[in-house]
Amino acid sequence: MEKAPPGAILLLMLFAHSCAVALNATNDPGADEFHVGVILDLGSLVGKEARTSISMAVEDFYASHKNYRTRLVLHVRDSRGNNFQAASAALDLLNNYNVKAIIGPQKSSEAFFMTDIANITLDLLNNYNVKAIIGPQKSSEAFFMTDIANISEVPVISFTTTSPSLTSDNNPYFLRATINDSTQVNSIASLIKYYGWREVVPIYIDTDYGRSIIPDLLEALQGNDARVPYQSIIPQSATSEQITQELYKLMTMQTRVFIVHMTSPMASVLFTKAKEVGMMDKGYVWIVTFGVASLIGSLNPSVLEAMNGALGVGVYVPKSTELDNFTVRWNTRFRMDNPNDPLLKLSIFGLWGYDTIWAVAQAVEKAKSTKDTVQIQHMTNSMTSLKVPKETENGLKFLNAILQYKFRGLSGYFDLSGRQLQPSTFQIINIVGKGWRDVGFWTAQDGFSQRLTRPRSNGTYLSTKPDLNPVIWPGESTNIPRGWEIPTSGKKLQVGVCTSDGYPEYIYAEKDPLIVGMTKASGLAIEVFEETVKRLPYALPYEYVFYNTTENISSSYDDFVYQVYLKASKTL
């Protein structure tokens, strides 16, 4: 294959797809071509959506900038969603320790990945002399790609990798054209505090994506006086039966407020099973994080039905005529790209992909506005016998051009100067029927609001009064759940009761004649006690134990209290 000119650029968008077609954005023979590698997982919702969006972005950009002397050319590849962690370790061994053999890997998918994906990636880097990589979709893929970027010194740009554990601190060529998952934790914790819930159970997938948000989430919840008595960790390979067993376990606990942080496929199984076991009934609270909330419109209708009553935290996308027009065109294009698939709803990931291409194309033109002197070194990779180009000048120049470019795109204010997008506004949604409705908005500056007014110059929005719209909770209830219930098992607090000789209106107790072992109690003291228990921020199961002080003249109230003391002493 003939190599592209030294000024070429590869934007490797790691999402996964099996296509090796170059999408040329121009017919101008005089334009400098910058080759962009696109690796997508088109078996996923986001991957399919992204391919359509980025293709349209290239076409739209150069239709609006016909005088530009640079052009991006996309080269689509397929990673098939394989595990990039094994490949990252293999490349580290091959490059840093010059090993001649690798034992394993353990999984066949890892082996296929090492031979397929590594070759695809390094082939693109070698043959097209790339200067940037866009992607990947998964955090595990991103770790692998940042290793490649560190070898070749090219930027990695991902608009879907939200894991907080992947930062630019140790990966200077990594840019996150999406949010960091940790940016949503304060909005979630504020939501818990707003409704007065005191205990929360996170349910998350046992991967880097699932685990990495937890420390920041726990800190935010603690700062809002909410306890986390238990964490439900779902293995990535969990079966439906295992998920059902975990749900039954949660039902035995008093907490009824759950925060779900996992991939949309696993969340679909979780909520389907939760519906089956009765955990989507009245009294339960479910909150899904950004990863699931952003894809609500593309989930199966049966899953949406199971999720009815849940809340979601997403990133607000400002409405605009440009967005409306693009959505219409995108729907038509998506049907053409995927004639055998049901129509997906365009999500913020597709918009970020579109805006990322515009940012890259603009940066390419800016970086090439002056004549470059390109110095390229090569590092041989033992596994593939391919050479990885190492940029020492233009990679940094291109990176700086991206960092300096700010604009208002389809997704809103697009600014990577901090090496990742900073969401200005989070949107709280309530899943109802076959869709969702707005509950309100949250900003770090103003907290909650029902509506947003005019935007500020920095992309943030002015909010209205600090309140939220009504919610239809699980079980079609409009009453705010208290967040806890008496557990189905466990010890109960035994409350001794007796009858007052002269004042039965103060306290009266007797054994229930219909139920063996049951004690009936009434009176002012009982009413005060039961009302106090109701106001506790947690469940306190209890039962009355009758103590007769009237039948035995030698017994007295003092004896009754002393018996309580003796029982406590024996317990100690």
State where each predicted segment sits.
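Extracytosolic ligand-binding ectodomains
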Residues: M1-K520, L524-Y547, S554, D558-K567
